[in-house]
């Protein structure tokens, strides 16, 4: 089965072709980072318009790269939610228009399910069941993944997602957009232990997260430093230490909660998905913990940590292989800007 995947939930336009026998044939991605940088964040209307401009050229790109023809495609999967309403509508409209014109079925995919399943795109995918740490700009969750569509929420953030905390801390430090990668790069120049920040809910006894207090702690300590050194020169030199302190604190919490989830479920496989999963400090800490504790940790390829069409094509193919009745030919679609992943549980 050959499935075309279309991702347009936020500020990346992604298209891909996935074959259930041959794997990922081709994927193409356009990021809107440069367009949104001058505004310091994603502008929804601009994002929607750019998806319209980019989708069809990307389709031609993946068809050319894969050698496939439109007649070879068996179904079209698109991101149905969650995400920006306008951006979702663009992707859904394009998917259903193509499907109508080509006489193909469609299937709407949960964006986070795509992330959860994205590590299955590697050469040696992890078998079910596993614990998944889903960590991105909008979500931070620990899930038990028993099979496609069989998900149990173990813990989640009570306020800011980890990626959101990265972005907000970047703004406090006067860094550019997107903030998460900038904070991580600056942290590598910081001195370990020079700035010590709290580890929120580290010993809460559950698997939930909270990152809003960590961001506030950065702001409070920065203000104290500014007051002590009027001129700001010391503060400029200290920014790397603040970034290091923030990243160390966030990583410590993510690793500790992941270990606790593995212990609670008695599983030995951890999958890390979402944009923050590309963070080098997080990967290094989890790899060290895996070696010490005797469990396996799996990641998608770095290029597939961000939003992409490959994960949507994969999720669509896996769902249609198990539940062919989920394919739709009525082309009357809806999008779900808010959509609880737990609602997919079978």
Swiss-Prot record:
Substrate binds at residues 134-138, 167, 180, 279. Keywords: Acyltransferase, Cytoplasm, Iron, Metal-binding, Transferase, tRNA processing. One of its GO terms (molecular function) is iron ion binding. Fe cation binds at residues 111, 115, 307. GO terms for cellular component: cytoplasm. InterPro entries: ATPase_NBD (IPR043129), Gcp-like_dom (IPR000905), KAE1/TsaD (IPR017861), TsaD (IPR022450). It holds the Pfam family TsaD. Its EC number is 2.3.1.234. GO terms for biological process: tRNA threonylcarbamoyladenosine modification. It is an enzyme of class 2 (transferase). It is found in: Cytoplasm. Gene3D superfamilies: 3.30.420.40. Its cofactor is Fe(2+). Binds 1 Fe(2+) ion per subunit. It catalyses: L-threonylcarbamoyladenylate + adenosine(37) in tRNA = N(6)-L-threonylcarbamoyladenosine(37) in tRNA + AMP + H(+). It comes from the Bacteria. Required for the formation of a threonylcarbamoyl group on adenosine at position 37 (t(6)A37) in tRNAs that read codons beginning with adenine. Is involved in the transfer of the threonylcarbamoyl moiety of threonylcarbamoyl-AMP (TC-AMP) to the N6 group of A37, together with TsaE and TsaB. TsaD likely plays a direct catalytic role in this reaction. Belongs to the KAE1 / TsaD family. NCBIfam families: gcp_kae1 (TIGR00329), T6A_TsaD_YgjD (TIGR03723). PANTHER family: TRNA N6-ADENOSINE THREONYLCARBAMOYLTRANSFERASE, TRNA N6-ADENOSINE THREONYLCARBAMOYLTRANSFERASE, MITOCHONDRIAL. This is tRNA N6-adenosine threonylcarbamoyltransferase. It comes from Burkholderia pseudomallei (strain 1106a). The gene is tsaD.
């Amino acid at each position: 089965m050959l499935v075309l995947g279309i991702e347009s939930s936020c500020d990346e336009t992604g298209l891909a072709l996935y074959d259930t026998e041959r794997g990922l044939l081709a994927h193409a991605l356009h990021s809107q980072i440069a367009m949104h940088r001058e505004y310091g964040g994603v502008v929804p209307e601009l994002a929607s318009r750019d998806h319209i401009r980019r989708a069809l050229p990307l389709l031609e790109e993946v068809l050319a790269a894969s050698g496939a023809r439109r007649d070879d495609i068996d179904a079209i999967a698109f991101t149905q939610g969650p995400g920006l309403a306008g951006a979702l509508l663009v992707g859904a409209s394009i998917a259903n228009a193509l499907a109508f014109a080509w006489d193909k079925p469609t299937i709407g995919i949960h964006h986070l399910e795509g992330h959860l399943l994205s590590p299955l795109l590697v050469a040696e995918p992890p078998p079910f069941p596993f614990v998944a740490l889903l960590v991105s700009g909008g979500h931070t969750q620990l899930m038990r993944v028993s099979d496609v569509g069989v998900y149990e929420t173990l813990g989640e953030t009570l306020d800011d997602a980890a990626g959101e905390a990265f972005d907000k801390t970047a703004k406090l430090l006067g860094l550019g957009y997107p903030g998460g990668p900038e904070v991580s790069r600056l942290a590598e120049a910081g001195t370990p232990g020079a700035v010590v920040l709290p580890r929120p809910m580290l010993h809460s006894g559950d698997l939930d997260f909270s990152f809003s207090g960590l961001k506030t702690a950065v702001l409070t300590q920065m203000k104290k430093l500014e007051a002590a050194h009027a001129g700001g020169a010391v503060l400029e030199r200290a920014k790397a230490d603040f970034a290091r302190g923030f990243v160390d604190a966030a990583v410590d919490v993510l690793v500790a909660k992941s270990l606790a989830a593995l212990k609670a479920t008695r599983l030995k496989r951890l999958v890390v998905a979402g944009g923050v999963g590309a963070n080098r400090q997080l990967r290094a800490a989890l790899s060290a913990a895996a070696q010490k504790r005797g469990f396996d940790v799996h990641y998608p390829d770095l290029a597939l940590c961000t939003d992409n069409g490959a994960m949507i094509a994969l999720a669509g193919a896996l769902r249609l292989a198990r539940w062919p009745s989920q394919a739709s030919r009525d082309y009357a679609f809806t999008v779900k800007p808010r959509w609880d992943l737990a609602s997919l549980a079978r």
